[in-house]
Structures are given as structure tokens and as C-alpha cells.
Regions:
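Glycosyltransferase catalytic domains, chiefly GT-A lineage
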Residues: 1-185
């Protein structure tokens, strides 16, 4: 869907965890902790993979359960170079009775829940330069997903309509991207 919703040519890289592991990029192992899905940690390798291809500017990570309804290039027009990373800053914690998330994984409650599901990385920012293979592979899920690798002033807002989550995002918004956190449509 991403490829159909863009007004300009973009370069997109799609890497599976197995490929990253085989090429020495991703060596952290699944440890049965709640963050341990195949892409929980590897999403934070996007800046490193871009650096290896001599890319600069902005790069995006997006969970695989998104459906884009608008031109993705409009999202890139929202970026601000003063930030290391930009995302939708959800103020949401899963309800106590929601014990499992997609694919039967244990649902955890923590600040910044869902923030890392769509991230725009400023590849030229010094904090992003620290987000490398060694840091990603040796950090805890909490360190990565709570954005402890940058400071709070360096995390910018993206408009909520780019990460519309049913039951979380205001129903008054017209979504530009729908995030199916509980499974596909």
C-alpha cells in the first residue's frame, strides 16, 4: 500500500530479521520478554542501515500493519530538522483487561506506548548517529521504546491522523493512515 500512496519516487528498503541476522546487523536474540517480537528491536536499526547506504536527510520506520490512505510524501513535509525523531505522541496505556496484543504476545503497559510504531528519523541529528547496531543489540526494549537514547526535547510531534488507532485516536480525525494494532481489516 505504501508504494501506491506516494507522489514522488522514494527508495524503500524492506529487511526481514533473518537477513539482518545473516549480515551481522542484528544479533540480539528473542528472550521471551514482552517486547520480543521479530521487529521490536530491529526497527531501531533503520538509521544504521541508511548510513551504510550513505543516505542522509530523513528515514521512516512504519509497522507492517498500517494502511496508508493519503500520499506518504505529505508526512515527510511535516518533519522539522531540530528533532532527532518525530512520531505521534500517544497518551495511551492499554486497559488492564487487554492482556494480549497482535500475534498473542503479552500486552505491556509503559509510557510512550505506540510511539515507535511510526517514526521519522533525522539521520543528520547527533542523537540518531548514536543509534547504531551495537546500541540496538545491547539495549533493553524499555530503553529503545521509551526513547531513552534521545532527550525529550528532541522528540517532535507528527499529526495524529498519520497513525490512526481505533479506540485510541479521536474519532473526529480523518485518518491518513490506519494502524491495525489488533489485526488486519
Amino acid at each position: 500500500e505504501f508504494l501506491n500512496r506516494r507522489s514522488l519516487q522514494t527508495q524503500h528498503l524492506y529487511y526481514r530479521k533473518a537477513f539482518l541476522s545473516e549480515n551481522g546487523q542484528y544479533f540480539d536474540t528473542l528472550d521471551s520478554k514482552p517486547f520480543s517480537t521479530e521487529f521490536s528491536f530491529s526497527r531501531f536499526l533503520v538509521p544504521e542501515l541508511c548510513r551504510q547506504q550513505q543516505k542522509d536527510g530523513w528515514a521512516m520506520f512504519v509497522d507492517g500493519d498500517f494502511l496508508f490512505l493519503d500520499d506518504i510524501m505529505k508526512l515527510f513535509s511535516c518533519v522539522n530538522n531540530k528533532y532527532s525523531v518525530m512520531c505521534i505522541k500517544f497518551n495511551w496505556v492499554p486497559p488492564q483487561d487487554e492482556r494480549y496484543k497482535l500475534d498473542g504476545m503479552i500486552q505491556t503497559r509503559y509510557s510512550k506506548k505506540l510511539w515507535s510504531s511510526l517514526m521519522m528519523f533525522n539521520l543528520n541529528h547527533p542523537h540518531i548517529k548514536k543509534l547504531n547496531r551495537d546500541l540496538v543489540n545491547t539495549s533493553t526494549g524499555s530503553h529503545l521504546h521509551k526513547f531513552r537514547w534521545t532527550d525529550k526535547e528532541s522528540i517532535g510531534f507528527l499529526p495524529d491522523e498519520w497513525n490512526y488507532v481505533d479506540g485510541v485516536t479521536s474519532k473526529s480525525l480523518k485518518p491518513k493512515a490506519i494502524h491495525y494494532t489488533k489485526g488486519g481489516p
